A protein has these predicted regions:
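A short beta-loop-alpha structural element at the N-terminal edge
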Residues: 3-17, 103, 149-161
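Conserved donor-binding loop and adjoining core beta-sheet/short helix segment
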Residues: 2, 9, 19, 25, ...
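Conserved acetyl-CoA-binding loop-helix of GNAT-fold acetyltransferases
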Residues: 79-88, 223-229, 233-250, 267, ...
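Acyl-donor-binding surface of acyltransferase catalytic domains
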Residues: 60, 67-146, 283
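Conserved GNAT acetyl-CoA-binding A-motif
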Residues: 94-104, 248-261
């Protein structure tokens, strides 16, 4: 059997990139959305990545990428992860991974090689991955009847979204750090400039939010779902997600993806019609993890 060719991708490889990932769409949203927004060439700019591909008979058979922010992203069978990681290490010997985004089985293989120090792990979760055909969504009654309404957030909303985001980050990663508010403000401002955040309101008062964190012409991925602790248990988070999905459907999307690690959120998403289609691993590291050479 001929060994696959492993090489760095360029924009000329985009058609093959899309053909490969479109068959693995549910677990490839970050890869596809970023590449659609910023291309496959790398100049260190936002949403770009260094993409390495394994090739067989003129088609991609595996993919590994290191994003501009240091997130390692994979979509490859286990027997190709080693050669792909070796190629990345050889070309980027000083590179650090600040995060890992991959299907759970692929992430497990990579973690065995990266061996992040326990103190550097700020988040490491295997989360159920869910899919919904938007024409089958069960829209919550308060949203259908207008008791709850949603609108797209703007930069003028930062003063109350940022404290929400700080609570979200503390709940997700633990520990309140002095820089969290400034980091949250920068992250939310950048998010609003690129992808929509939707605010759910009742009687003019914001009570929850949900956002798109990746988009394609026919698909969206939902993230950033948050309800303030004192308002939880009232269905606001579920309605916020539904509002974000209605906007996606109105724009032409037919499919939605999301993942979650909490039972309450899972129940809410299943009530909308989401069904589990896999497991996805999300990890964040600070300090970053050096991409170690293979033994």
């Amino acid at each position: 059997m001929t060994a696959p060719e492993i090489r760095r991708l360029s924009q000329a490889d985009y058609p093959a990139f899309e053909r490969f990932l479109s068959g693995r769409a549910e677990s490839s949203m970050f890869l596809r959305s970023n590449a659609r927004a910023a291309g496959l060439d790398y100049a260190g700019e936002a949403f770009q990545a260094r993409y390495f591909g394994a090739w067989g008979t003129d088609e991609l058979t595996g993919l590994l990428a290191l994003s501009w922010g240091g997130h390692l992203m994979a979509q490859a069978p286990a027997d190709l992860l080693g050669p792909l990681l070796a190629a990345l290490q050889a070309e980027e010997p000083e590179a650090m991974a600040t995060g890992l985004l991959a299907p759970a089985d692929q992430a497990a293989w990579l973690l065995e090689r990266l061996k992040p120090a326990p103190e550097s792990v700020k988040l490491s979760e295997i989360e159920p991955l869910f899919r919904l055909d938007l024409d089958r969504m069960a829209v919550p009654e308060p949203l259908r009847t207008g008791v709850l309404v949603a609108r797209r957030a703007g930069l003028e909303d930062l003063d109350f979204i940022v404290p929400w985001r700080v609570v979200y980050d503390v709940e997700t990663m633990g520990g309140l750090r002095p820089e969290m508010e400034a980091d949250a403000r920068a992250a939310i401002a950048a998010w609003i400039e690129r992808l929509p955040i939707f605010l759910l309101e009742t009687e003019g008062r914001p009570v929850a939010m949900a956002a798109w964190n990746a988009e394609l012409p026919d698909m969206v991925q939902i993230g950033g779902v948050f309800t303030p602790p004192e308002l939880r248990g009232r269905g606001y988070g579920r309605a916020a997600v539904a509002a974000a999905l209605i906007a996606a459907r109105d724009r032409g999307a037919t499919t939605a993806i999301l993942f979650t690690h909490t039972p309450a959120a899972e129940r809410a998403y299943r009530a909308l019609g989401f069904e589990q289609v896999g497991l996805y691993h999300i990890a964040l590291y600070d300090p970053g993890v050096r991409l170690c050479p293979l033994p």
